[in-house]
Amino acid sequence: MAVEKTMDKIVALCKNRGFVFPGSDIYGGLANSWDYGPLGVEFKNNVKKAWWKKFVQESPYNVGLDSAILMNREVWVASGHVGGFSDPLMDCKECKARFRADKLVEDHMTENGAEVATADGWTNEQLKEYIERNNIVCPKCGKMNYTDIRKFNLMFKTFQGVTEDAKSEMYLRPETAQGIFVNFKAVQRTSRKKVPFGIAQIGKSFRNEITPGNFTFRTREFEQMELEFFCKPGTDLEWHKYWKDYCWNFLLNLNVKAENLRMRDHGEEELSFYSNATSDIEYLFPFGWGELWGIADRTDYDLSKHQEHSGQDLSYLDQTTNEKYVPYVIEPSLGADRVALAFLIEAYDEEELEGGDVRTVMHLHPALAPFKAAILPLSKKLSEKSLDIYAELSKKFNLDFDETGSIGKRYRRQDEIGTPYCITIDFDTLEDESVTIRNRDTMEQERIKISEIENYIQASLEF
């Protein structure tokens, strides 16, 4: 029987097992702020490593970059963020609650059975008309008395240096992409890459969201994994399809079920004026379908804007054809926190065992699991041998060492945090140099030589 997966269960497990804690908790917390605990930081790092492995290490096209969070203000003027990076904001006059008008509309669409609920690209007038026509009341107080819809810029503003004036004004970056665009020429020249090629980056971004929520799904501080793939104009739709398929298969290969994913291609009315195509990979979260991965064909918009604003030549000269052009860009953009949450939800399970006992187990792909194995001596008299095994294997893998409690309880603890293998050291180990290794998913056990453990674990990490 399928287990009911709720956000309450996921949040409780994350907090109780050290995946994610509420931020600033001893001071009463900070709304929508989360800290990754000992298991969470290992897990999230594994998610990032998996992405980097497939999108940089194993790709002949792509190279990496780590650009600064703080950039010249003119970067954001050129990109359009200073003038247009905003959400439609409205307040309830009765209870003073604040909402994104487009999210009120989309929630209403979802509640009324719309297969695709989106108000992307709607004007303030369209949003207001829909809210009034459908009598959408305030979710907090049930009244319908709103302020006019206005634009709210999502960037966090700060100042550089000791003076707070227009010259020292700057922003925390709302996306990592612009750092890639402004480094396009430098990366292309030094890496000697020819179009088509991509620049990948993992890094923190910040958005002053009006209505963050759903745990780590939407937060004001978040981490992105973005690729900007530069291609020749006219080949962009072909590359857009290539990266759509590549991203989809990345998720499937890490144990996300296809039935919990859908590919949604944006209609013409949703597309940005500069985009030839945009597609979202959506995941079925406990609270409904939510965007996981955006794959956008941004044409030459970004490089052209920076070329125009900076006065620098950002075109590319094809040495073979002697043709000069501004490359088009395909952008697969993924939130590390959001996809990590999806992996946790996908992995969560409750299994009823013989005798009515229930075990909570996280069926994480071994490549993502915080610990690849746990070393479990049956007796503290076996600690020395167990620590020797730990010392050798820990050179290759992140391991847990647990010698307290019954072996059954220790198995359950490891199941709940997603550890793929439990390695039991018993008194026979001292004689035959063998251990018992238990599989998390099947709970089956087998006896193998200590010398075979490394290859045994390593084989399961491939994807």
From Swiss-Prot:
Its Enzyme Commission number(s) read: 6.1.1.14
| One Pfam short name | tRNA-synt_2b
> Which SUPFAM superfamilies does the record match to this protein?
Class II aaRS ABD-related, Class II aaRS and biotin synthetases
The reply on keyword Protein biosynthesis is yes
UniProt catalytic activity: tRNA(Gly) + glycine + ATP = glycyl-tRNA(Gly) + AMP + diphosphate
Cellular compartment(s): Cytoplasm
Which molecular-function annotation in GO is an example for this chain?
catalytic activity, acting on a protein
Q: What is its main location?
A: cytoplasm
Known function: Catalyzes the attachment of glycine to tRNA(Gly).
Q: How does it assemble?
A: Homodimer.
Concerning InterPro entries, the annotation shows:
aa-tRNA-synt_IIb (IPR002314), aa-tRNA-synth_II (IPR006195), aa-tRNA-synth_II/BPL/LPL (IPR045864), Anticodon-bd (IPR004154), Anticodon-bd_dom_sf (IPR036621), Gly-tRNA_synthase/POLG2 (IPR027031), Gly_tRNA_ligase_bac (IPR022961), GlyRS-like_core (IPR033731)
Annotated positions binding ATP: 207-209, 217-222, 291-292, 335-338
Chain sites annotated for binding substrate: R100, E175, F222, E223, Q224, M225, E226, E331, P332, S333, L334, G335
GO cellular component entries: cytoplasm
Coiled coil (UniProt feature):
none
Which keywords does this Swiss-Prot/TrEMBL entry list?
Answer: Aminoacyl-tRNA synthetase, ATP-binding, Cytoplasm, Ligase, Nucleotide-binding, Protein biosynthesis
The answer, when asked if Magnesium is one of the entry's keywords, is no
HAMAP family to which the protein is assigned, alphabetical: Gly_tRNA_synth_B
Recorded protein name is Glycine--tRNA ligase
Q: What residue stretch is flagged as signal peptide?
A: none
Family named by the database record: Belongs to the class-II aminoacyl-tRNA synthetase family.
Query: Highest taxon of the source?
Result: Bacteria
* GO BP terms: glycyl-tRNA aminoacylation
